[in-house]
Amino acid sequence: GNMMGAISDETANLLMVWHIWLGALFTLNFVGYILFAPDRFAVTMKNLMEWDKNTIMWFRNFGGYPRRFFKIPFGPEEVPPQGRYNGGQKMSYLIFIAAIAYLIVTGWLLWAGAPLLGKTLFYWLFITHVWGSIVVTAMVTCAHIPLALLSMEHFKGIWRVGPGDISYEAAEHHSPTWLKRDVVKVVEK
């Protein structure tokens, strides 16, 4: 028997094989980003770790999203200017990075190190691995993807082959502090 109840052992085993292959792919993706684009990763982390007054003030009205999309008059109307990432992005991306690192470590420990862990440690790693994956999946499904779709310019930047640039105008609207401090406008003649 398996923990999923209604499926056959063969199906459960096949799902576990797929799980391990996808885990290996996620591991290669994350580790590859750090190893093959360390400067890009460092810049991303620098931008995520810079919390100023405006970052904190973003949470007073959650960037105006409740007012704009749900007509809920939450907090002040004014959204303070943000850097490369707004307060919500900084918080969620830091959670994503920590959770992905945790899921990678616990996943490999559960798969390769199971005989060495002992029942209690295995149990708690398993529980936190499962719940961590549920939390990350919920964040991606309920917040990250819907909010990315609200900004088509950013959404197109994600899927564009190459650097994933966005227009100067989109950056000016969403990230004015970052634009003023870090971005050089190139004017083509």
Show which residues each predicted segment covers.
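Membrane-embedded alpha-helical bundles that constitute the cytochrome b-like, heme-associated redox core
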Residues: G1-K189
